[in-house]
Amino acid sequence: MDFLNSSDQNLTSEELLNRMPSKILVSLTLSGLALMTTTINSLVIAAIIVTRKLHHPANYLICSLAVTDFLVAVLVMPFSIVYIVRESWIMGQVVCDIWLSVDITCCTCSILHLSAIALDRYRAITDAVEYARKRTPKHAGIMITIVWIISVFISMPPLFWRHQGTSRDDECIIKHDHIVSTIYSTFGAFYIPLALILILYYKIYRAAKTLYHKRQASRIAKEEVNGQVLLESGEKSTKSVSTSYVLEKSLSDPSTDFDKIHSTVRSLRSEFKHEKSWRRQKISGTRERKAATTLGLILGAFVICWLPFFVKELVVNVCDKCKISEEMSNFLAWLGYLNSLINPLIYTIFNEDFKKAFQKLVRCR
């Protein structure tokens, strides 16, 4: 996104020399982040394209997100690095307009993709049967197209207002002199998608938790109706033990109290039932914790990366007396860019199919 920079023309040669190590460090660090973002998103895109098992409408949204984040890495980050290191814009206003357009559009599109993915997952859980019919490649394509169209509509007005004021040739920024422009762009690009994502993921977690409990209760109810409360292996084992035990007793001692024998068998079954119930509770608890962890990572990364930047954009541009340093402004912008590196990691790291696809790509199989 846009941020302020100052010219270094007034600095002496000695001052520039003293600042050189820090500039080199910043340049290498940011270049490393850009390279990592490019590589990881490329892997996600390649994995989805070449792996037939990943050809699913839900993964098309992931692929489109990866394409968007890839564009941020190759079209936005490099220009930003040059701008930060040089401390002035040297590529002319035409390139500046193109860079700002791509910057705002791609960053907005990346955020809106997260909303689309949240909506897709919400419908897949809460309306599984009906949505399974609608969840087609065409449907995914329509969602992706809508996301890009909305992103363009959100990003274009700030660029139009940019040309209403005068800009120096050595700077490439959007001056938010219009409060309406600031509110429109920040709420459209972040605050509204954030509210939507928070609501959807809260409902997803509640729905998933309820679904686990219903399935668990349904399995137990079915087994109790059938008179079975054991795992298949445990059931066979118990039948074998109880049958041989009864047969042995009946042959060796005709006066055996069979009520006691059946009591022993019931006791064994009760123990297996308790063990099975405990195992299921453990599995259910593990699933819920995993779901909570995944959702927590998704929301946490998104909020940590983008919230500071958009708070700054809203406060600084609405409040005339509020100022922020150039270094902090740059840091907040790159904290937002960092989300393009984190996105492919979070959305694929918990998926075994993606892990296997990555391994095949790395091994060139």
UniProtKB/Swiss-Prot annotation:
Residue ranges that the UniProt entry lists as topological domain Extracellular: 1-24, 82-96, 160-178, 316-327
Topology, Cytoplasmic side: 50-59, 120-139, 203-291, 351-365
Motif window: NPxxY motif: 343-347
Domain of life of the source: Eukaryota
Intervals of motif DRY motif: 120-122
GO molecular function: G protein-coupled serotonin receptor activity; Gi/o-coupled serotonin receptor activity; neurotransmitter receptor activity; serotonin receptor activity
Spans through the membrane: 25-49, 60-81, 97-119, 140-159, 179-202, 292-315, 328-350
UniProt record, GO biological process: adenylate cyclase-inhibiting G protein-coupled receptor signaling pathway; adenylate cyclase-inhibiting serotonin receptor signaling pathway; chemical synaptic transmission; G protein-coupled receptor signaling pathway, coupled to cyclic nucleotide second messenger
CDD domains in the cross-refs: 7tmA_5-HT1F
Assigned keywords, A-Z: Cell membrane, Disulfide bond, G-protein coupled receptor, Glycoprotein, Membrane, Receptor, Transducer, Transmembrane, Transmembrane helix
Protein name: 5-hydroxytryptamine receptor 1F
Organism name: Pan troglodytes
Gene name, Swiss-Prot/TrEMBL: HTR1F
